[in-house]
UniProtKB/Swiss-Prot annotation:
It comes from the Viruses. It comes from Avian leukosis virus. Residues 609-690 form the Peptidase A2 domain. One of its GO terms (biological process) is proteolysis. A motif (PPXY motif) lies at residues 172-175. Reverse transcriptase: Error-prone enzyme that lacks a proof-reading function. High mutations rate is a direct consequence of this characteristic. RT also displays frequent template switching leading to high recombination rate. Recombination mostly occurs between homologous regions of the two copackaged RNA genomes. If these two RNA molecules derive from different viral strains, reverse transcription will give rise to highly recombinated proviral DNAs. Mg(2+) 3 binds at D1344, D1401, E1437. This is Gag-Pol polyprotein. Residues 1548-1567 are annotated as: Involved in homooctamerization. The keyword Protein biosynthesis does not apply. Its EC number is 3.4.23.-, 2.7.7.49, 2.7.7.7, 3.1.26.4. Capsid protein p27: Proton-driven dimerization of the C-terminus facilitates capsid assembly. Residues 100-150, 181-217, 544-571, 1551-1603 are annotated as: Disordered. Residues 1333-1496 form the Integrase catalytic domain.
Length: 1603
């Protein structure tokens, strides 16, 4: 045993690696197998014949006992045994065919492995399971090269000894491992001689000949290949061979070729062009199936190899299909011999399995070519799947990237993509036109049409670039080179403080701009006109502070300013492109006023400057010459501005600056708040941040730069409700991190001009959320404001159908950047969208802002966005009627009949939108190919959805709702049939969004089909030249329709339509198809603007002429063609069904048997009766859980199935069933339980059925009345006593107890009879009972809310009383809510402890979901009293009254006659609780607190009898508590305790032994001894015991007194 365990453990470590089982687990498994009798000895485990029985036995044991440890261990051991066995087989056969000794080993199979004679020790390098044959193989002479024989026949061909067979096959090793074929070590020099030279070397021409007569070919040097591959570690050591064109002879491959290919795959990947070239070179000659599979095992891993096998099989099936259609197909040998099949092509036919020589002899040349081509195509598919190519559609030419580098990247990505070779060149050329830089795009558009290859385009662009004229970019580059030395000199001097020789500056003068001197030495320096002017900086005369040398430094040149401490709070990345120099007359200059809003003292609050409008600058820059010297500045995160001339140092204003533009008439444009940059530039610049905020835009009209103001007529006023009083909701507190992020986002929006300071009386909260990228997003909670708005009506009824775009038209997609923020908000509405930016700990006054543009989250923003964009685009729609322009929110799609027309229209649309104030994202402009719009991918001929996940996460009802919504969006594009939507519709039942849902098997299977459908199905774009067709069909669980073209021949679907969910109990298929045809015609007009040209109807309508009335109504006004044909193949995915127009039910009698049906709710039975001769036959069904309507339907269904092939008349008194059955005259869709029952019965009938309705209990004589009475009597057979009770009550109106006794029915049935009486049911029938009390403290509490006006404003008091100890707990609340009740109970639990149960009324505060959850968490049971009946809460009601009286007395004693001051309410309430709980009440000798914390132990009192519902007295009870009108009794057998009225309790004098316990009873029962009936019973005790047969006389008297 130990030796076997050691051998198996070694084998498992070799072949299983880290997952190998331990020796202990192997020993336990072997012991179990021997115990179960599956192994006679441990060595039997080596026999393959025992493997299957062991596997079956362990699997059965795991399923029965749930223990799978031994089965898991056996799985690992079995894998190791099989791997060792396959290695042994391959090694033996390889040695055998190489002539190195060894014996014949059968092909792989459990029955052919030999039992090892010895076992090896892995640590000493011995063979695993080494057989005697293997040992002999090692001893065989090396020169042996002839095939071995078994018996008297050759193993190769089965002929006698001495045949000329030269070689045989070695099956490919099926297991992955680097240590395979250990017995072939050192065999490389012992291979057979005289074969062909290796492939890759110089090869002599082989003589053609038959395979069986050719000399033995030289096999590839396996040991040498193994040595070569040891470093790269290929998955399997195997050598492919090729077939020469001269004949079926093998040519060995050069091992270095295989090594190089394996290394190329490992380093370059499968999709590399080098890999593809080497694989195609190796497969340039026809290969055998044996060679193909071995080659793929070498270069592919296990998973890609499995994918390749599947893909190869698919390709071979295509070859077989072509060969089946054409008998003279090359694979069929030009019609000679048997046709090809899959077994032949895979080398699995007779004589080919594991025999490459047999494959070479039996396979035809055409088959070899097909095998090799299919294998190569499968390899390409696997390479695409295993290593997906990069997205070539996303490659664009960078701003500084050369065209050659861009072309290299693009061509490499396209060549490695999934595109077919014929489509790659057009795609590359099209990407050149769209993805290159704008100037190169213009060159390509101007290229001659004769340039049709990428190489020609590249050469043309390079040639044109050499001779291209000077462009704006070229001028800018030249200017940059010219002025860079000058600007950098200034920058270096400012940065390093360096000067030239002699102390002279190397920079420029700030006054005149000339180099060589400082500002102080400038000859053009302005002199002061007032010599007596006093400097405020140095107190000197003759100059002002601006000219003071102390300010400018030693030489008068301005040094760097003193910077305030602390970094700039807003993290920005300014990248400014300064405006190019213009002529002075064309420079767009404006007059600007700057106002400092800081709180520190400055000399000037406002200054006037002249600034240059520059739409190329990102931010606003104020020149240091214009910047007041006492306005502080701070450092920024980016200390430089980058422009054409290089970098310039910059700072930012520490205070917020108000900037306003002065118009020509002197008026001031709306001011803008911002933090401008301050730098050493010649003149101030207003950048895009300022232009957008002020509503200014720099445009170029007729070559002259002007300034335009965006018109405010685009602002659409909002509509407010009549009571739109201002809403003020305090800002939520935010943590410091989020507050900092909010501050940064607000400052950014302020600089962009989207918000402005506000003093509005409106306020709603703002907050931030973190995005997936790590940045924050600003959100504004506008729910309260939306409640005051009147929503606008929808202006766009859904999204456009993209398949309506004409087929082949080029497309362009535009994206409006920040569309909401580009549309102004009406000025009168802005104050309603104000918010507050708080500070931590209120360290500073809060800053308030309001939106100037459409805010996100406002209910009217989407509608206004659509209206404004549509208004801007309307003139273009009128100007270009043939242009297709799809507009949905901020996404635009343009389609034109030509590329030139599309480009022209696109430029016009972009310019129109930009003039209106919108921004187009250049990087989001899409052109074909690869256009995506509204979640769909559009090609020149198709429209396909994108974005389906592998498997969605489903946990709640809301998750299912979202998933169904997404599928509904995709259904018109994918054609998802109703049967696949059914499992998801089933999960939508419920009302709680958080209700748990699971991803069940039906949903999983349906989702798999939907995902598969999304990869294959797509809509086809409409071709206006072809007729538009429509078709409808019935399918599983509904009906389906489609609009398309060529539906009956080559279907091209354009839009899918589906029937709606049924809203009636039953809908006939004819009605469903009628509604679907109407919907199809309306969709065609709405989507394509035309009626359907051809309508395809199911074949049933061809057989039923004229058409049914419903179909004719649906076709009213239809002028197209109608065709009736079989269901088109496009509906196969929906599993179409035949539509039958046969009438199944009529309301006229038919010749055949007549049956009567009825059902009763009292007996819960349904019956069917019919007359057979003189007597009635009866059939019954019973179901206590079914309704009367379902019982009636089941009875009719049972009647219909009595004679399925015979016309039958069904008579029923149920109008509901009769009407429904008549509506089900034709096949249809049921939606209720009764309809499903009837439809199932009708579907099983083949004959006509007639349904006849009669009125029940009518006095009309005849056969129908008689049959109905018989059915009614059988259905209500057990209700005769109940009918008698009804009659007796109608006559005498007696009570339920009397009815129960008189008619022998239950009390429940008697109460139901009384309650159905309109005269006796004026008040609800209530049982006699008593309020349950606790037998001890903390068993039952009663809680109630009571109103005490003296305690206003918190005038609601929550009162809880312990029903056993009478202890009271009171809390004060402002409103009666669930939260108040939970808070009160938490306080009461802290004072008294946790109760077992609480009784309340049925108020919403006690019965809400949150309250139920709170009680469940505390483990407290909850019950409610009778609604509207205060007696159900008697104890707490008395406690309310007692508490209010105590509060009144205490308040009046303190001088508060009416309202108690708020400051005194808490103290007074505590005094009232103290007085009620800590002092005796009434006749009690203990206080409630004493009874609560020191309760009296109850003992059982005397035996009693109680009166039950039937009026009888039941024995076996003992008294526990006796009170005023109530008692608690305990059952002696079950220990059950119940509360009953005292009038239903009397002593049980028959229990003699128990009477003596009266004296030992608790004082609680002291009053019972004075009870008169008790005394009477005690005095007659002896007499009662003696006679024991005669009823005691006093009992009648007691009963009389009780009544």
């Amino acid at each position: 045993m130990e030796a076997v365990i050691k051998v198996i453990s070694s084998a498992c470590k070799t072949y299983c690696g880290k997952t190998s089982p331990s020796k202990k687990e192997i020993g336990a498994m072997l012991s179990l197998l021997q115990k179960e009798g599956l192994l006679m000895s441990p060595s039997d485990l080596y026999s393959p014949g025992s493997w299957d029985p062991i596997t079956a036995a362990l699997s059965q044991r795991a399923m029965v006992l749930g223990k799978s440890g031994e089965l898991k261990t056996w799985g690992l051991v079995l894998g190791a045994l099989k791997a060792a066995r396959e290695e042994q087989v391959t090694s033996e056969q390889a040695k055998f065919w190489l002539g190195l000794g060894g014996g014949r080993v059968s092909p792989p199979g459990p029955e052919s492995i030999e039992k090892p004679a010895t076992e090896r020790r892995v640590d000493k390098g011995e063979e695993v399971g080494e057989t005697t044959v293997q040992r002999d193989a090692k001893m065989a002479p090396e020169e042996t090269a002839t095939p071995k024989t078994v018996g008297t026949s050759c193993y190769h061909c089965g002929t006698a000894i001495g045949c000329n067979c030269a070689t045989a096959s070695a099956p490919p090793p099926p297991y992955v491992g680097s240590g395979l074929y250990p017995s072939l070590a050192g065999v490389g020099e012992q291979q057979g001689q005289g074969g062909d030279t290796p492939r890759g070397a110089e090869q002599p021409r082989a003589e053609p000949g038959h395979a069986g007569q050719a000399p033995g070919p030289a096999l590839t040097d396996w040991a040498r290949v193994r040595e070569e591959l040891a470093s790269t570690g290929p998955p399997v050591v195997a050598m492919p061979v090729v077939i020469k064109t001269e004949g079926p002879a093998w040519t060995p491959l050069e091992p270095k070729l295989i090594t190089r290919l394996a290394d190329t795959v490992r380093t370059k990947g499968l999709r590399s062009p080098i890999t593809m070239a080497e694989v195609e070179a190796l497969m340039s000659s026809p290969l055998l199936p044996h060679d193909v599979t071995n080659l793929m095992r070498v270069i592919l891993g296990p998973a890609p190899y499995a994918l390749w096998m599947d893909a190869w099989g698919v390709q071979l099936q295509t070859v077989i299909a072509a060969a089946t259609r054409d008998p003279r197909h090359p694979a069929n040998g030009q019609g000679r011999g048997e046709r090809t099949n899959l077994d032949r092509l895979k080398g699995l036919a007779d004589g080919m399995v594991g025999n490459p020589q047999g494959q070479a002899a039996l396979l035809r040349p055409g088959e070899l070519v097909a095998i090799t081509a299919s294998a190569l195509q499968a390899f390409r598919e696997v390479a695409r799947l295993a290593e997906p190519a990069g997205p070539w559609a996303d490659i664009t030419q960078g701003p500084s990237e050369s065209f050659v580098d861009f072309a290299n990247r693009l061509i490499k990505a396209v060549e490695g993509s999934d595109l077919p070779p014929t489509a790659r060149a057009p795609v590359i050329i099209d990407c050149f036109r769209q993805k290159s830089q704008p100037d190169i795009q213009q060159l390509i558009r101007a290229a001659p049409s004769t340039l049709t290859t990428p190489g020609e385009i590249i050469k043309y662009v390079l040639d044109r670039q050499k001779t291209a004229p000077l462009t704006d970019q070229g001028i800018a580059a030249a200017m940059s080179s010219a002025i860079q030395p000058l600007v950098m000199a200034v920058v270096n001097r400012e940065r390093d403080g360096q000067t030239g020789p002699g102390g002279r500056a190397r920079g420029l003068c700030y006054t005149c701009g000339s180099p060589g001197h400082y500002q102080a030495q400038c000859p053009k320096k302005r002199k002061s006109g007032n010599s007596r002017e006093r400097c405020q900086l140095c107190d000197g005369m003759g100059h002002n502070a601006k000219q003071c040398r102390r300010r400018d430094g030693n030489q008068g040149q301005r040094p760097g300013r003193g910077l305030s401490s602390g970094p700039w709070p807003v993290s920005e990345q300014p990248a400014v492109s300064l405006a190019m120099t213009m002529e002075h007359k064309d420079r767009p200059l404006v007059r600007v006023i700057l106002t400092n809003t800081g709180s520190h003292p400055v000399k000037q609050r406002s200054v006037y400057i002249t600034a240059l409008l520059d739409s190329g600058a990102d931010i606003t820059i104020i020149s240091e010459e214009d910047w007041p010297t006492d306005w502080p500045v701070v450092d920024t995160a980016n200390p430089q501005i980058h422009g054409i001339g290089g970098g310039i140092p910059m700072r930012k204003s520490r205070d917020m600056i108000e900037l306003g533009v002065i118009n020509r008439d002197g008026s001031l444009e709306r001011p803008l708040l911002l933090f401008p940059a301050v730098a050493m530039v010649r003149g101030s610049i207003l950048g895009r941040d300022c232009l957008q905020g002020l509503g200014l835009r720099l445009t170029n009209l007729i070559g002259k730069a002007t300034v335009l103001t965006v018109a405010l007529h685009l602002a659409i006023p909002l509509k407010w409700k009549p009571d739109h009083t201002p809403v003020w909701i305090d800002q939520w507190p935010l943590p410091e991190g989020k507050l900092v992020a909010l501050t940064q986002l607000v400052e950014k929006e302020l600089q962009l001009g989207h918000i402005e300071p506000s003093l509005s009386c409106w306020n709603t909260p703002v907050f931030v959320i973190r995005k997936a990228s790590g940045s924050y997003r600003l959100l504004h909670d506008l729910r309260a404001v939306n409640a005051k708005l009147v929503p606008f009506g929808a202006v766009q009824q859904g999204a456009p159908v993209l398949s309506a775009l004409p087929r082949g038209w080029p497309l362009m997609v535009l994206d409006l950047k920040d569309c909401f923020f580009s549309i102004p908000l009406a000025e009168q509405d802005r104050e309603a969208f104000a918010f507050t930016l708080p500070s931590v700990n209120n360290q500073a006054p809060a800053r308030r802002f309001q939106w100037k543009v459409l805010p996100q989250g406002m209910t009217c923003s989407p509608t206004i966005c659509q209206l404004v964009v549509g208004q801007v685009l309307e003139p273009l729609r009128l100007k270009h009627p043939s242009l297709r322009m799809l507009h949905y929110m901020d996404d635009l799609l343009l389609a034109a009949s030509s590329h030139d027309g599309l480009e022209a229209a696109g430029e016009e649309v972009i310019s129109t939108l930009e003039r209106a104030g919108f921004t187009i994202s250049p990087d989001k402009i899409q052109r074909e190919p690869g256009v995506q719009y509204l979640g769909y991918k559009l090609g020149s001929t198709y429209v396909a959805p994108v974005g389906l996940v592998a498997e969605p996460r489903i946990a709640t009802l809301w998750d299912v709702q979202k998933l169904v919504g997404s599928l509904q969006w995709l259904r018109p594009a994918l054609g998802i049939p109703p049967r696949l939507m059914g499992p998801f519709y089933e999960q939508l039942r419920g009302s709680d969004p958080n209700e748990a849902r699971e991803w069940n098997l039906d949903m999983k299977m349906a989702w798999r089909e939907i995902v598969q459908l999304s990869t294959t199905a797509a809509l086809e774009r409409w071709d206006p030249a072809l007729p538009l067709e429509g078709a409808v069909a019935r399918c599983e669980q509904g009906a389906i329709g489609v609009l398309g073209q060529g539906l009956s021949t080559h279907p091209r679907p354009c839009l899918w339509l589906f029937s709606t969910q049924p809203t009636k109990a039953f809908t006939a298929w004819l009605e469903v198809l009628t509604l679907l045809i109407t919907k199809l015609r309306a969709s065609a007009v709405r989507t394509f603007g035309k009626e359907v040209d051809i309508l395809l109807l199911p074949a049933c309508f061809r057989e039923d002429l004229p058409l049914p009335e419903g179909i004719l109504l649906a076709l009213k006004g239809f002028a197209g063609k109608i065709r009736s044909s079989d269901t088109p193949s496009i509906f196969d995915i929906a599993r179409p069904l035949h539509v039958s127009l046969k009438v199944r039910v009529t309301d006229h009698p038919v010749p055949g048997p007549t049956v009567f049906t009825d059902a009763s709710s009292s007996t819960h039975k349904g019956v069917v009766v019919w007359r057979e001769g003189p007597r009635w036959e009866i059939k019954e069904i019973a179901d206590s859980g079914a309704s009367v309507q379902q019982l009636e339907a089941r009875a009719v269904a049972m009647a219909l199935l009595l004679w399925p092939t015979t016309p039958t008349n069904v008579v029923t008194d149920s109008a509901f069933v009769a009407k429904m059955l008549l509506k089900m005259g034709q096949e249809g869709v049921p939606s209720t339980a009764a309809a499903f029952i009837l439809e199932d019965a009708l579907s099983q009938r083949s004959a006509m059925a007639a349904v006849l309705h009669v009125r029940s209990h009518s006095e009309v004589p005849g056969f129908f009345t008689e049959g109905n009475d018989v059915a009614d009597s059988q259905a209500t057979f057990q209700a005769y006593p109940l009918r008698e009770a009804k009659d007796l009550h109608t006559a005498l109106h007696i009570g339920p107890r009397a009815l129960s006794k008189a008619c022998n029915i239950s009390m429940q049935q008697a109460r139901e009879v009384v309650q159905t009486c309109p005269h006796c049911n004026s008040a609800p029938a209530l049982e006699a009972g008593v309020n349950p009390r606790g037998l001890g403290p903390l068993q039952i509490w009663q809680t109630d809310f009571t109103l005490e006006p003296r305690m206003a404003p918190r005038s609601w008091l929550a009162v809880t009383v312990d029903t056993a100890s009478s202890a009271i707990v009171v809390t004060q609340h402002g409103r009666v809510t669930s939260v108040a009740a939970q808070h009160h109970w938490a306080t009461a639990i802290a004072v008294l402890g946790r109760p077992k149960a609480i009784k309340t009324d049925n108020g919403s505060c006690f019965t809400s979901k949150s309250t139920r959850e709170w009680l469940a968490r505390w483990g407290i049971a909850h019950t409610t009293g009778i609604p509207g009946n205060s007696q159900g809460q008697a104890m707490v009601e008395r406690a309310n009254r007692l508490l209010k009286d105590k509060i009144r007395v205490l308040a009046e004693g303190d001088g508060f006659m009416k309202r108690i001051p708020t400051s005194k309410q808490g103290e007074l309430l505590a005094k009232a609780m103290y007085a009620l709980n800590h002092f005796e009440r009434g006749e009690n000798t203990k206080t409630p607190i004493q009874k609560h914390w020191r309760p009296t132990v109850l003992t059982e009192g005397p035996p009693v009898k109680i009166r039950i519902e039937t009026g009888e007295w039941e024995k076996g009870w003992n008294v526990l508590v006796w009170g005023r009108g109530y008692a608690a009794v305990k059952n002696r057998d079950t220990d059950k305790v119940i509360w009953v009225p005292s009038r239903k309790v009397k002593p049980d004098i028959t229990q003699k032994d128990e009477v003596t316990k009266k004296d030992e009873a608790s004082p609680l029962f002291a009053g019972i001894s004075d009870w008169a009936p008790w005394k009477g019973e005690q005095e007659g005790l002896q007499e009662e015991v003696a006679s024991n047969k005669q009823e005691r006389p006093g009992e009648d008297t007691l009963a009389a007194n009780e009544s």
